[in-house]
């Protein structure tokens, strides 16, 4: 009889232990589920950064992102049609890739404009089955033109088209890419370069991208070349369209870092060190072409672009071990506002912990301790001066990209910036690093703020900067078929 009682008691204890484990797990699983279709303006929770509270869902009468559009009238100065296709294509170096093209090539065609030009792009989806969009990475366009599926528009279905119109705001090096299933479509080749500037004799555009493990410059593996006469001041516009930081630089002559993320560097000096270019970031390198030429190196000497007079063989070799540090490069200059008088002070703490995301077990990214979609929505009003501290204890680096704005770096790991104002739209935040940035909220809308290692964004490392009173008629997931990451 005692044995029977002991067995019963043992079963009850085992059942209790099992329930004690399964019930919390079931709760965590259930609360991790992302709604089949949701409004991105209503996800997460409102973070007002110490400023006045605003109704997270409906403040005042509300303004739709559709109202925040580019010019509806006027003859465009730049008028192009871009056609997206899912297809097999050949790289410039001959390898066959099964991916995505724009007008039959990848990278897609260069879009060139001048400051103040009205740009009109008619985007046609010929055969990208999941739909596609065009996002203008680094160009602070009006919100409706931002090209984010489910936030500022619906993804363009096969057979559909969408027209983007915006004024080219500032000279610089930028790029366009799909922001629908971007972790797949950008990787597969749905992107291209944009330059806002008049063409110059020494200009070289170098878009770096990895296709199926093959890293390329302008779609070419190995060594390419660009003919530029000796004595010409060359401006090499480098675009990192991959998901990880890459060291780049010129060898064969000293060079200057003259622009970062489409913003001029004040007082650039000659360097020979490599430049660490974040995923999604751009850098303009300037040098006078020597008689023997020079070479852009991307990562290692296995991928390079010789730049020099026809017939010259530019010097080869790897980049030096030291790197340009923008925290102290160049000379100070006014930034146009006072970060010490911030209206909002935000924290963006990036971490990682085990759990469930949309019912899937794993090790997931967190923002301020919360997993997507229960992440902070950074709430601002137009005209606010905003400070944000971005810290990273996740174990991996993250290239953080804020849409619609450029921010200035104030400090890294508590050390104040002393060089040129370091303006960014894409900032590499390494593990155990902390950056302070500041910007003016001067472009109303609903703006993504996410990691541009795009698989990380698809795993939940994304949120939004949300302006008072702005709503969106678009939805993400479910029957909307919008999946921005």
Predicted regions and their residues:
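Beta-strand signatures of extracellular beta-sandwich domains
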Residues: 133-137, 247-249, 399-401
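Primarily extracytoplasmic ectodomains and periplasmic/lumenal surface modules that are beta-strand-rich
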Residues: 87-91, 117-120, 127-131, 174, ...
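Active/binding-pocket-proximal capping segment
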Residues: 253-261, 368, 393-422, 454-458, ...
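Flexible loop/turn segments at secondary-structure boundaries
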Residues: 214, 244-246, 256, 266, ...
């Amino acid at each position: 009889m005692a044995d029977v009682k002991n067995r019963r008691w043992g079963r009850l204890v085992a059942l209790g232990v099992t329930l004690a484990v399964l019930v919390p797990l079931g709760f965590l699983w259930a609360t991790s589920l992302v709604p089949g279709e949701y409004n991105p303006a209503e996800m997460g929770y409102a973070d007002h950064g110490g400023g006045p509270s605003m109704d997270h869902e409906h403040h005042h009468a509300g303004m739709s992102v559709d109202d925040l559009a580019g010019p509806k009238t006027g003859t465009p100065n730049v008028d192009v049609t871009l056609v997206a296709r899912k297809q097999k294509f050949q790289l410039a170096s001959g390898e066959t890739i099964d991916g995505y093209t724009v007008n039959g090539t990848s990278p897609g065609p260069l879009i060139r404009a001048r400051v103040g030009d009205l740009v009109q792009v008619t985007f046609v989806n010929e055969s990208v089955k999941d739909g596609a969009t065009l996002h203008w990475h680094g160009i602070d366009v009006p919100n409706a033109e931002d090209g984010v599926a489910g936030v500022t528009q619906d993804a363009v279905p096969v057979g559909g088209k969408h027209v983007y119109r915006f004024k080219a705001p500032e000279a610089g090096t930028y790029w366009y890419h799909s922001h629908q299933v971007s972790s797949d479509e950008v990787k597969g080749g749905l992107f291209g370069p944009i330059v806002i500037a008049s063409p110059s004799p020494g200009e070289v555009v170098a878009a770096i991208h990895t296709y199926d493990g093959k890293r390329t410059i302008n779609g070419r593996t190995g060594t390419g070349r660009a003919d530029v006469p000796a004595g010409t001041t060359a401006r090499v516009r480098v675009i990192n369209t991959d998901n990880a930081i890459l060291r780049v630089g010129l060898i064969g002559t000293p060079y200057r870092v003259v622009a970062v993320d489409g913003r001029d560097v004040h007082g650039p000096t000659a360097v020979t060190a490599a430049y660490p270019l974040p995923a999604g970031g751009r850098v303009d390198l300037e040098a006078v072409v020597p008689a023997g030429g020079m070479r852009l190196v991307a990562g290692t000497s296995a991928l390079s672009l010789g730049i020099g007079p026809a017939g010259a063989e530019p010097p080869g070799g790897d980049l030096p071990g030291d790197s340009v540090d923008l925290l102290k490069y160049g000379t100070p200059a006014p930034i146009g506002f006072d970060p010490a008088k911030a209206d909002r002070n935000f924290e963006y703490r990036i971490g990682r912990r085990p759990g469930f995301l949309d019912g899937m077990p794993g090790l997931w990214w967190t923002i301020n301790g919360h997993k997507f979609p229960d992440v902070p929505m950074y709430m601002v009003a137009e005209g606010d001066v905003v400070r944000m501290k971005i810290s990273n204890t996740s174990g991996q680096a993250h290239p953080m990209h804020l849409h619609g704005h450029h921010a200035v770096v104030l400090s890294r790991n508590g050390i104040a910036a002393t060089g040129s104002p370091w303006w960014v739209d894409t900032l590499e935040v390494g593990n155990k690093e902390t950056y302070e940035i500041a910007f003016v909220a001067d472009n109303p809308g609903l703006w993504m703020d996410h990691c541009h290692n795009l698989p990380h964004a698809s795993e939940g490392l994304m949120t939004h900067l949300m302006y008072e009173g702005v709503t969106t008629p678009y939805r993400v997931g479910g029957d909307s078929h919008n999946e921005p990451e």
